[in-house]
Amino acid sequence: MSASHALILLRHGNSEWNRQNLFTGWVDVRLSEQGVAEAKRAGELLAESGLVPDILYTSLLTRAIQTANHALDAADRLWIPVVRSWRLNERHYGALQGLDKAETLEKYGPEQFQLWRRSFDVPPPPLADDSEWSQADDPRYADLGADLPRTECLKDVIARMLPFWESDITTSLSAGKTVLVTAHGNSLRALVKHLDGISDDDIAELNIPTGVPLVYKLDDSFKPVEPAAYLDPEAAAVGAAAVAAQGKK
């Protein structure tokens, strides 16, 4: 089958809470200065590579939307259609949202910390609706009702992301459009797991860096015809190592 479908995945740039080493999840924080620079560089990489996004899919969280806007502006594609969906939101980190990662690691130990952070099917404790970090009263999720998560594991993220991939994103790919998905570490890990057929155990080792475009060439069944490639491999390696080290002082 022909490699006629180009898919670009872009994790949002470094956020204020990434900078402070806090669990973020669905808390709506903005990009740091570093994150803005990463997003602009991502757009420059797209332009330099000749990849021209025809449509953008992103989440309802500001850091992803900001990243997309800066990247598209740098690539002179700010005018393309945009589809936003909660299904591309970051994994909901439950009661961990707002906590310092290093302090959480010290309090609960490395085994529990990694279980909450990287296990496929073990979610953190749920977030109470009266927490200052709750989304229970957030108007952007008013239509979710019982679907509004209070915590998630990666398995849950896949369950809410895949229907959107299958109903919306693949439709654009089938139409011959180059698709840019600007989202989050775990929603993109969920999609990469699906695309690359990564096992439930091995997905724990996958770390996606902030602000570096990852390019897939897909066949007509939306299977990769070759391994996905970062447009800046060196920056991606440094960024992935930084993600892996989160929790350390």
Curated annotation (Swiss-Prot):
Disulfide bonds: none
Alphabetized Pfam families for the sequence: His_Phos_1
Residues at which substrate binds: 11-18, 24-25, 63, 90-93, 101, 117-118, 185-186
GO biological process: gluconeogenesis; glycolytic process
SMART domains associated with the record: PGAM
Pathway, per record: Carbohydrate degradation; glycolysis; pyruvate from D-glyceraldehyde 3-phosphate: step 3/5
EC number of the protein: 5.4.2.11
InterPro entries listed in its UniProt record: His_Pase_superF_clade-1, His_PPase_superfam, Phosphogly_mut1
GO MF entries: phosphoglycerate mutase activity
Site (Transition state stabilizer): H184
Active site: H12, E90
UniProt entry keywords in alphabetical sequence: Gluconeogenesis, Glycolysis, Isomerase
Reaction catalysed by this enzyme: (2R)-2-phosphoglycerate = (2R)-3-phosphoglycerate
Record-stated family: Belongs to the phosphoglycerate mutase family. BPG-dependent PGAM subfamily.
NCBIfam families with a match to the protein in the record: pgm_1, PRK14115.1, PRK14120.1
HAMAP family reported for this sequence: PGAM_GpmA
Function: Catalyzes the interconversion of 2-phosphoglycerate and 3-phosphoglycerate.
The protein, known as: 2,3-bisphosphoglycerate-dependent phosphoglycerate mutase
Species: Leifsonia xyli subsp. xyli (strain CTCB07)
Name of the coding gene: gpmA
